[in-house]
Amino acid sequence: MSRGCPENNNFLTNNNQMVLDMILYPLIGIPQTINWETVARLVPGLTPKECVKRFDELKSCGSSPVDNQYNPLMAAGEGPVETLATYIKSSLLDAQGDFQETPVDQDTVSKAGRHSIATTRNCSSESENCTARNAGEETGDSEGPNMVIHVCDEAKSLKEDFICPRDLLISEMKYFAEYLSVDAQRWEEVDISVHCDVHIFNWLIKYVKRNTKDSKDCELPALEPGNVISILISSEFLKMDSLVEQCIQYCHKNMNAIVAAPCNMNCINVNLLTRIADLFTHNEIDDLKDKKDKFRSKLFCKKIERLFDPEYFNPDSRNNAATLYRCCLCKKLLTRETERRISCIPGKINVDRHGNIIYIHIRDKTWDVHEYLNSLFEELKSWRDVYWRLWGTINWLTCSRCYQAFLCIEFSHCQYHSEVVVYSSAVNSLNTVGTGIYPCCNQKVLRFDPTQLTKGCKVRDHMVLLHDQGENDDSLSCPTAKILDDLHKHKDVIAVPFLKDPVSDPGVGSCDEKGLEYEILLEPNTPWGSKTGELNAFLSLKNWTLQLKQQSLFSEEEEYTTGSEVTEDEVGDEEEISKKQRKKEKPKKFTKPPKKQLSSPCSQKKEKTLEKSTSRDVSPFVVSMQKNKWDATRSLRFNQDAQREDDQRRMSEITGHLIKMRLGDLDRVKAKESKEFAGGIYSRLEAQVKASVPVTARQNSSDKNQSNIPQRHLFNYVHSNFIRNSQKLETSQMFIN
């Protein structure tokens, strides 16, 4: 009976082996690679290794192992063997990439509203009247069998069936690739049910068949303001990438008509919202006519998120808020780009190695950006205004009047004096040479001010000149011009009113003798040969406490002693007499503790300058250098004691400074902890619930709720909300993981 190998009779006793031989025989002699996993799926109960082994046996035999009783069936021209061979060559060899495609996880797909909720189920293999099987008999060489999709519209109580070729459905709607790309399902019947709006899915099927022969005479479906949102959500769920891009572009061009149409904009997920917002500039969003605020606030919220993205190139802002912080000294909001351009208090001025003045800000550890944004929203009542205020906080310009860099929110803070400064002549007063006074506010000023800080009693708008315009006078081509143009358009929201700060802005407003910014100390008889009445190069400024603290480290005072003022190794009585005289000259200094003296070095410096003897009338800088030198005329024991006293004084000051820094951090942490609610998490949740309800609604419903809901139930209400929110959080984390 067998025309091939002797084991063929054993194979023919099993129908699965016969089907495997019918599949493998047409593949003999084909150079292409065979996907054995796909072949094993076609025949139940076989593994890929068994298929490879049987294929090698068939190649060694060289003829078909099927018995003669099946020859009449295989000899027919349109028999199932030739049809099967055609199918194997087209699917197992040409379309191997489809089987290696990564399946789509249905659980991770977001389902918004009632659109495009698809389910698949396997029909019974014994059913002979399945619709999908009847439709699948009309197969094409390129598009495969037709698939029937049952659409159920619960809102309109409608049901309709749509027919689409399998390959076309997979290529356009990639959501169905998981269920229709496996060839083993060709042997079973597949039924697809979609819960969606019938008219929307009809539009989608027409779009899928736009390039087929049947649709040449049909009109291509067009997007409209009334259906684009539903089509966008459905196409994004079905993974129709080209249609999603078309819908996003259409939304960008026709957003005014879309928000005016009766459509639900809340179904748009975060990914689609981000892609739509990236196409808009902030001026385009600001020009949207959204009376009901259906979508504009969401776009501005997404723009705010983009301002905090350090990796995103923002065409609307040359700076980002990723490094935003607040200085605990000047209370200004700064970023890494603006911290060295914006001035701090005069005590934090420094000079770099190139001679340029730089500013050193100290980060406020208690400031939180989330609390700042929430406070801005409570103040401005609109996310649009919050965006523009934040945009003005991180962008800066340079004024051509005061030559100072300023934040856009400080556009109206250009300080100036209404009258010209008047300098006194040397004949009138020797003590005021090089200083002047503004008659408008009686503020004293140096002729040559090393701080270069512009102060004034009045404020006005800054003036910015554009020097980098293009050849065609396109002023908006440079970033500075764009920032200035946006600042002028939204000045009412961005600019904040000027508030006088006595710490950082002491020169604004009326100045009396007590509130002067500088305390000028003139030393006519300087030891380095200056003329009478000439200013010292190291002028002592009132607010420059940093220099005074540095000089105090080199000054030698009597309160820092080790108790060995007079030693046994001292030679001569003149030293003991001079020490006793110096001790009698300053008897009051030992009454104050050293800590208080360390805390106020400025006041000590003023007292010490008055108590200096005539023999020590030189500059404090020169004195400090002389006092810390090794005195060869003194004994070794005296110099060692002086060195130990100096080391002890320095360590005391360092310890006090470290303690002050540590206590400062603790105070900031305690201040942050004091902001927390005393009642814990439940009181905070209660405050959030009350804050989320509008004021008018709370006032209207306060009388009803007061009589119906007792106060003792408030804890249970907040507790139930807390448990519900915790369950939602755990569920979301489970899907994320």
UniProtKB/Swiss-Prot annotation:
One of its GO terms (biological process) is isotype switching. Signal peptide: none annotated. Gene3D superfamilies: Potassium Channel Kv1.1, Chain A. Residues 147-255 form the BTB domain. GO terms for molecular function: identical protein binding. Residues 580-595 have a biased composition (Basic residues). Homodimer. Interacts (via the BTB domain) with HDAC1 and NCOR2. PANTHER family: SANT AND BTB DOMAIN REGULATOR OF CLASS SWITCH RECOMBINATION. This is SANT and BTB domain regulator of class switch recombination. It comes from Rattus norvegicus (Rat).
